[in-house]
Every structure is written in C-alpha cells, then in structure tokens.
C-alpha cells in the first residue's frame, strides 16, 4: 500500500476489513472519523482498470445524480494518480442473492415486499433517463432496516435522446439478458430492464434461474425461446406477472408504469409503489448545516454554499452522513476535534470543488436529460392494457459467467461472447453527465423531510420458508467484524485516538504522511506514545488476535442467514471435516484460526472464486455453525460449490 495513494483517504476514514473483491476493485468497510458512521469504500486501481476506466466514469456520474431511498448513496469520490476511491453507503445485510440462497426461496409475501422496492428503484432511475442494464440479486444490497439498495451502475446507459433512444451495446450478465440483447438487435434500455426484473423475481420465488446452462450459446437459445419451468408453488397471479415481464417480444412486455399498481404488487397494500425520491439532493437540512458550521467554526451561509455545490468531497460526505444519522433517529452531532485530529477541521475550509476526474470525456456538448418519464401526468394503470400469456417451461439449472461485449453500428446476428471486450473511447450511448459546479442542475420536486426513526430491529427477523434438503449458502454478514481491530463506537471516539492506532487497520504506519504532530497537544503526544508502545507489545504477544476470538475456541456470532447451523458440537471436529473435504472439491485454502480462506482456479491458474468459511459458535446456544462469505466469483456457481462442500461434510 503506497503512502501517497491512501494519504487523502486516511484524513477522513479509518479502514477496516475487506468485504468484497472484484476483477479490478476491492471494497473495504470503513468508519467516517467525524460522524462515526460506517461506510463502504470501493478501491480501484487505475492501471488495472485499463480500458474499463470509462465504466467507472459512467458509474460515478450516475450515482452523483441519483438520490433515492432504494439506490445506494454515493458520499465521496477521491482520485489520486494511481487510485480511485468511491465512498458508498454501507449495507450490513449483504447481497439479496445471499438472502435468497440461505432461505432456498422466498415466500410470495416476502418476495412482494422486496419486489415493490425493486420496482420503486427502477421506476426512479428510468424517470431520470437511465437504464441500469445489469439488474440481478447480486446488485441489490440489504441495509440495516431490511430495505433494498440498488448498486453497480457501471453498465448503465443515459441515452442522449432519452429512454426511447435505441441502444446497441450488449452487456450485463447472460442469464438476465433480454432476448433482443443477445440477438445483437437495437433495443430500448427500459424494456431490457423489465426482462431482467422478471428473471430476478423468478429467482426470488424459486431459488434458481428460469434460463440457465453452462454452455452460453445453449443458454441464449433458451432465452430466445422464452420457455421456462413453472414450479407448482407459484400462484396464478405471480405466474401471470412473470409472463408479462418475460415476453420475448419487447413491445408486448409490461412497462414500469403499469407495474406500479399491478394487482400482484398491490395485494395487501392500499397504495401503488412509491417511486419518487424521498431524498432530493436540492434539499439541505438546517440542523445538519448548523452542526457542521459550529463544528468547523464557519458561517452558516458559507457552509450552506459549500454543501449545495455537491462536489462529492469531504463536505458532501460529512453532510450526507450527518443527515443519515438524523434520519435514523441518532443525535445530529459530530465527534470532538481532538478525537479525530485537526486535519479534518482545517481541511474543511480549504476544500473547494475540484476539477473533474481524469476520465476521457465524450465528444461534443450534450444537453443533460432529466425525467424522460413523467408518471404523474398519466393514468398509472391503463384499462386497455392487454396482458399476453404463454406456457413457459425450462428445467432448473445454474449460471456461470458474465456477458459484456460491444457492437458498433452494425451488430452481428450471432454475437461473439467476450469476457472483457473493451473499446477505449466508447461511451456513445450516454449523454454527458459531467456537471459544472456553477450550474443549477439539481431540479427536484418539493423535498420530503425524513422523520427520525429508531432502528427497527424487529424487522430483521428472518421469515421461515420451506427449504430444500440442503442448507444453502451465502455471502458475508460478518462484515461487522474487522480483521485488524474492532470498529469504534461513539463512546470510544470521545477519547483522544492517536493516529498510530487509527492507521493500524490498514497494515502500514501511514500517519506521518498526513498528521502534523506539531498541531497536537502535549498530552496527546504522551498518550500516543504510550498507545504506540502498547500496540507493539500486544502485536508481539498476540499477533493473530481478532475481536471475538478466545484461546478456547471460535468466535461467537449471532444467528444470521449467512450462518449454517450444524449438528456437530465440537468446533475442531467440524473444522477438520471441512479441511478434509476441500481438496476433493479442487479448492485451495489458507487456514487462519477457525477461518478458511478458500479459492478455486482455472486450468490456467486464474482465480475464479474466492470465499471464506468460518467455524463459529452461535450466541446464546451451544450450537456450532459455519459462516459463509463470497468475496469473488459467480454467485450461482458459488451456491453450488458451497452446498456441495457442506453436503460432503454431512453437517
């Protein structure tokens, strides 16, 4: 880790453990120093990105202009010569995919709750002129209140002529791709999203995909036929809705507008799906402004002006995280400057809107498009809308791989599948969303002021659903357990925290790069020295000690849907069984305590899957469990593999 690359980031955040990895990025859990709020930081290496750099630009531009209760919030963007950091809303519930496989499948009632939120998010982004183009359970996260947040806008499109403008680039995940995409035809982005939503809803209620095959070309043929299996547990209403979304002819597909108050989505509800944003960026909360101005000793007028520039720097992040605290019923308070060092305070006044990120800009000046769909001016549900139906049938299987290939003006009838087909200057489908800071671009409806609410812990209970004969697996919920040190609470931050302790979590002593020790009080220096010596002593004596571990056994965790319970009472016995099984499944692993860091590789040595299996003790019981976390690789392949491993362990 180069000091220069992380110097700016460490002024404002304390890094914790890695919670996800990808082809060119990793995601770390972190704490915002002055609010104490948890965030997720997506760390991307520019050199590794290569020709995918425009995709990052697309994602950042989209997230800067999307603010919705079911869209993951962007807080802060930091660029260095080698790195790009995206500071995002942290969703401790993990991926919706993991939730599905842990429960085998969802009941119709639970699927309806989630699907209404998905429709809300998609209707909103369509109203802002965007098509997502990569809708799938892995791109929906669950927050602390069991609400969904849509993520990963790297493949989204904002057509220059609005959503009725035809697109040509075929992208996304093969199993969720609409027939017109894989045929290489020009398509409407919003129509393709509807098909993906149908596949997603099917996965919610069935626990597997409607179209799947290990051979991608066979998979395409199944998709183009549009025939899939109808399990006996699906109700007539859900079967009808699935058929309306997964119509091979995009013109016969139901629209988002008609989904908003579709009978299936309205069942048990008195109002249509609310798609409008409750958090328009044009609204600035006075309580948050007051706290920021007092904390930084800056005038309210100047503070308001800096916030309203929406530069997605530390000012934006501090305001949005403070506002998030308020909306969750927490005190609108920032931590004392001594607890976070003077750098954050002095930097606030010095921060000004910076130049755009160093991305290649599209040619020409394109008008910025807002609200290409106006749902409120028309009847939400047309009486003359005719629902077409058919009898789909396809056996259950699993998917693998991700589709992303680009076509130019004339697309071939049979597309050539490529893993990373990139064109350096290609972003022809998106309008120029780079926003000049002196322009009034945030034209929003009247703001909705969130009323403070307490965390609704009762909503976190997992509904019971009939399960198959194998216990299913899923990704990390243990994101709340830092690898290097526990995440500080508000009370912990009230004390003076030396920069040495704060930087320990990123494995290097980076504090000298960004802490001016001359600004520290003498007492702070003394305590910092004592703490530094104490840290060294603890590290020498217990180099692998982690929060929750004891010499006697594994960590104690709360029962969660990413923890599989077992009938084995001896944790060492369970760990040994897993270790014996892994080689037979061609899984390499490294053992650290009761955690097994696993990976699979292709014949050419490329890592295709990374995940963790941890033997743990469930709190308030003597039951031993296995925590599962997918870090990298295809979700459905991961599902099969971990099911196979645990089945062989006979747990």
UniProtKB/Swiss-Prot annotation:
Gene: melk
Enzyme Commission number(s): 2.7.11.1
Keywords: Apoptosis, ATP-binding, Cell cycle, Cell membrane, Kinase, Lipid-binding, Membrane, Nucleotide-binding, Phosphoprotein, Serine/threonine-protein kinase, Transferase
Pfam families recorded: KA1, Pkinase, UBA_MELK
KA1 domain span: 602-651
GO molecular-function terms, A-Z: ATP binding; calcium ion binding; lipid binding; non-membrane spanning protein tyrosine kinase activity; protein serine kinase activity; protein serine/threonine kinase activity
Residues of the Protein kinase domain: 13-265
Region (Autoinhibitory region): 328-651
EC category name: transferase
Active site: 134 (proton acceptor)
Activity regulation (record text): Activated by autophosphorylation of the T-loop at Thr-169 and Ser-173: in contrast to other members of the SNF1 subfamily, phosphorylation at Thr-169 is not mediated by STK11/LKB1 but via autophosphorylation instead.
GO cellular component, one term: cell cortex
Renumbered residue ranges of the record's region UBA-like: 284-323
Membrane topology value: Peripheral membrane protein
PROSITE patterns documented for this protein: KA1, PROTEIN_KINASE_ATP, PROTEIN_KINASE_DOM, PROTEIN_KINASE_ST
Stretch list, region Disordered: 410-490
Descriptive protein name: Maternal embryonic leucine zipper kinase
Modified residues (Phosphothreonine): 169, 414, 449, 451, 481, 483
Keyword Nucleotide-binding: yes
Post-translational modification comment from the UniProt entry: Autophosphorylated: autophosphorylation of the T-loop at Thr-169 and Ser-173 is required for activation. Phosphorylated by the maturation promoting factor (MPF), composed of cdk1 and a cyclin-B. Also phosphorylated by some MAPK. Phosphorylated during oocyte maturation. Dephosphorylation destabilizes the protein. There is some ambiguity for some phosphosites: Thr-481/Thr-483 and Ser-505/Ser-517.
Species this protein is from: Xenopus laevis (African clawed frog)
Subcellular location: Cell membrane
Record PTM Phosphoserine, positions in chain: 173, 498, 505, 517
């Amino acid at each position: 880790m180069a000091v220069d690359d992380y110097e700016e980031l460490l002024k404002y955040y304390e890094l914790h453990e890695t919670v996800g990895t990808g082809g060119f990025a990793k995601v770390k859990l972190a704490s915002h120093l002055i609010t104490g709020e948890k965030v997720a930081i997506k760390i991307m290496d520019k050199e590794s990105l290569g020709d995918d750099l425009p995709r990052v630009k697309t994602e950042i531009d989209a997230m800067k202009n999307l603010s919705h209760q079911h869209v993951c919030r962007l807080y802060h963007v930091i660029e260095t010569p080698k790195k790009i950091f995206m500071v995002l809303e942290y969703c401790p519930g993990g991926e919706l995919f993991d939730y599905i496989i842990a429960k085998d499948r969802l009941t119709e009632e639970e699927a309806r709750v989630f699907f209404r939120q998905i429709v809300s998010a998609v209707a909103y982004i369509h109203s802002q002129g965007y098509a997502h183009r990569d809708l799938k359970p892995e791109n929906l996260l669950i927050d602390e209140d069991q609400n969904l947040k849509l993520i990963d806008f790297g493949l989204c499109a904002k057509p220059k002529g609005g959503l009725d403008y035809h697109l040509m680039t075929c992208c996304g995940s093969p199993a969720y791709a609409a027939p017109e995409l894989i045929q290489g035809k020009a398509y409407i982005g919003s129509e393709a999203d509807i098909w993906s939503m149908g596949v997603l809803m099917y996965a919610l209620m069935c626990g597997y995909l409607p179209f799947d095959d290990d051979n991608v070309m066979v998979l395409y043929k199944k998709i183009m036929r549009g025939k899939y299996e109808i399990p006996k547990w699906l109700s007539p209403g859900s079967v009808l809705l699935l058929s309306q979304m997964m119509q091979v002819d995009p013109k016969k597909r139901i629209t988002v507008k008609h989904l908003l108050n579709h009978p299936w989505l309205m069942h048990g509800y008195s109002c249509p799906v609310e798609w409008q944003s409750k958090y328009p960026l044009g609204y600035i909360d006075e309580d948050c402004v007051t706290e920021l101005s007092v904390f930084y000793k800056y005038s309210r007028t100047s503070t308001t002006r800096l916030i309203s520039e929406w530069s997605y720097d530390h000012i934006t992040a501090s305001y949005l995280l403070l506002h998030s605290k308020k909306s969750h019923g927490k005190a609108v308070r920032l931590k004392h400057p001594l607890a976070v060092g003077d750098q954050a305070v002095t930097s606030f006044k010095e921060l000004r809107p910076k130049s755009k990120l160093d991305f290649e800009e599209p040619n020409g000046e394109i008008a910025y498009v807002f609200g290409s769909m106006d749902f409120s001016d028309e009847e939400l549900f047309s009486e003359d809308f005719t629902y077409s139906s058919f009898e789909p049938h396809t056996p259950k299987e699993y998917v693998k791989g991700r589709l992303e290939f680009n076509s130019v003006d004339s697309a071939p009838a049979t597309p050539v599948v490529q893993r990373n087909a990139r064109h350096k200057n290609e972003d022809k489908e998106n309008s120029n969303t780079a926003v000049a800071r002196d322009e009034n671009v945030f034209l929003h409806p009247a703001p909705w002021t969130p009323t403070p609410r307490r965390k609704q812990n009762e909503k976190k209970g997992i509904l019971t659903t009939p399960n198959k004969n194998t216990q299913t697996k899923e990704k990390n919920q243990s994101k709340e357990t830092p690898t290097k040190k526990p995440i500080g609470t508000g009370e912990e931050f009230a004390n003076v925290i030396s920069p040495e302790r704060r930087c320990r979590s990123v494995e290097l002593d980076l504090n000298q790069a960004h802490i001016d020790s001359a600004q520290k009080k003498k007492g702070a220096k003394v305590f910092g020295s004592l703490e530094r010596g104490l840290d060294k002593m603890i590290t020498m004596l217990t180099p692998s000690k982690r929060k929750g571990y004891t010499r006697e056994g594994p960590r104690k965790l709360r029962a969660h849907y990413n923890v599989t319970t077992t009938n084995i009472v001896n944790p060492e016995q369970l760990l040994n069984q897993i270790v014996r099984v892994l080689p037979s499944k061609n899984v390499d692993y490294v053992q650290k305590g009761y955690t097994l860091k696993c990976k699979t590789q292709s014949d050419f040595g490329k890592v295709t899957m990374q995940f963790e299996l941890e033997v743990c003790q469930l709190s308030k019981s003597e039951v031993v469990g296995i925590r599962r976390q997918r870090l990298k690789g295809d979700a459905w392949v991961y599902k099969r593999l971990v099911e196979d491993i645990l089945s062989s362990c006979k747990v």
